[in-house]
A protein has these predicted regions:
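Intrinsically disordered, low-complexity boundary segments flanking structured domains
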Residues: 19-23, 34, 55-61, 93-94
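Active-site acidic/histidine clusters and adjacent loop/turn architecture
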Residues: 1-33
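Amphipathic repeat-derived elements
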Residues: 1-9, 38-47, 57-65
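Short amphipathic alpha-helical surface micro-motifs
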Residues: 14-17, 51-55
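Extended, low-complexity, intrinsically disordered C-terminal regulatory tails
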Residues: 24-54, 98, 108-110
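Catalytic cores and adjacent binding grooves of peptidoglycan-active enzymes
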Residues: 59-132
Length: 132
């Protein structure tokens, strides 16, 4: 059974308890890595500068503490395998819905949560966030 490494566990610990619980269930079935949890102002500005985020500090879900967002990717990470990210997102969202049916979780390739990715203009494949 896969498990999170030390760095992933540290990043995960900065996230909302629901995101931690979902990720801890997902890792039991699919090997994955936590790329990002909470982002401070410097990290958020850097993410925007690199084109990894459009939200400026303190407006990003990663900027809350605990973080209302997590960047989680199937391991090993292959940034060119978009289908794998999509498959992984479906698994993550399914686990999330089973665990927290009344919590809206949004994936970074379906920002409006309508299961239509063709209307997305900013693709952030490893990103999941809680919308309340």
């Amino acid at each position: 059974m896969p498990k999170f490494g030390k760095v992933s566990r540290q990043r995960l610990s900065t996230c909302d308890e629901k995101l931690q619980n979902i990720a801890n269930e997902v890792i039991k079935h699919v090997d994955c890595t936590v790329l990002c949890g909470h982002r401070n102002e410097k990290d958020q500005n850097e993410a925007v500068a690199k084109g990894h985020s459009k939200a400026t500090y303190p407006n990003g879900r990663h900027n809350a503490y605990p973080s209302k967002a997590i960047d989680l990717a199937p391991y090993p990470v292959d940034w060119e395998d978009y289908e794998r990210f999509t498959l992984f997102a479906g698994f993550f969202l399914g686990i999330a819905k089973m665990m927290y049916p009344d919590t809206k979780i949004i994936w970074g390739n379906d920002w409006d949560g309508d299961f239509d990715t063709k209307d997305t203009n900013f693709r952030d494949y490893p990103h999941f966030e809680i919308r309340e």
